[in-house]
Amino acid sequence: MKNQAHPIIVVKRRKAKSHGAAHGSWKIAYADFMTAMMAFFLVMWLISISSPKELIQIAEYFRTPLATAVTGGDRISNSESPIPGGGDDYTQSQGEVNKQPNIEELKKRMEQSRLRKLRGDLDQLIESDPKLRALRPHLKIDLVQEGLRIQIIDSQNRPMFRTGSADVEPYMRDILRAIAPVLNGIPNRISLSGHTDDFPYASGEKGYSNWELSADRANASRRELMVGGLDSGKVLRVVGMAATMRLSDRGPDDAVNRRISLLVLNKQAEQAILHENAESQNEPVSALEKPEVAPQVSVPTMPSAEPR
């Protein structure tokens, strides 16, 4: 028994593998994070030192569609070659040339932003003043193609003027004097127009009519604005429209057609009015050279055989 062989027991032990390589993966993630942070602060620094003109060019670059860039459409630059230009030969026009931003379009956007801010200021003024808040149904403020339009509308229960005259009622006076200082906040000029209903005068169009009444009411509104503090020279035009531009489809004699329209003009509308009333630079027709008339040559014709 002592010489009996005992079975050999083999024990396999797994050696613990070193995780040194895995433990260093955080360094890669940290390096990526630091690279991203460096790129972020680099972009912020470049934005802070860039001029407004350069910022506009950068924005236009990122707004350029990929299809436009591939097909060679209108890009941020007008160069004939995608390769940046260089060299000492200034007579060559090929190469990358900076495209100037559309200054006129930028001015229009800024002006539109000013008009929207003015509308917000007027709404805030109306809401903050209990007296004006009660008159909110008589005010209509909207943005139109010519600028910001403020309409003060009449009603049967509360007219703006005394019947058939240009005497301003107290509530109308309060509105005009309250909005006058707000209008001084922007450089845009103003056009005032008076409107009436279609109810005719007994004397007809030959005497005092709705034309005179609408013009007188518009001018009376101008005076109240000046009393309220409107800057001199702010008003560009005062016109009377009579009943030619109805506001409501309920009838030509509806009370809402009696109104004062105050238009804060944008630059384009202002230039159109100035051009309309400017002295014409064209030469009179009599001063123009007469076109030369080619000499007429008479050609004998053959007599027709039969009348048709």
From Swiss-Prot:
Residue spans of biased composition, Polar residues class: 90-101
Impact when changing R222H: Complete loss of motility
Protein name (database record): Motility protein B
Effect of D197N: Complete loss of motility
Listed transmembrane segments: 28-49
InterPro entries: Bact_OuterMem_StrucFunc (IPR050330), MotB-like_N_dom (IPR025713), OmpA-like (IPR006665), OmpA-like_sf (IPR036737)
Gene Ontology terms: cellular component: bacterial-type flagellum; bacterial-type flagellum stator complex; plasma membrane
Consequence recorded when altering A39V: Complete loss of motility
Primary role: MotA and MotB comprise the stator element of the flagellar motor complex. Required for the rotation of the flagellar motor. Probably a linker that fastens the torque-generating machinery to the cell wall. Overexpression of this protein with MotA improves motility in a pdeH disruption, (a c-di-GMP phosphodiesterase) suggesting there is an interaction (direct or indirect) between the c-di-GMP-binding flagellar brake protein YcgR and the flagellar stator.
Species of the source: Escherichia coli (strain K12)
Effect of P159I: Decreased motility, subnormal torque, tethered strains rotate very slowly
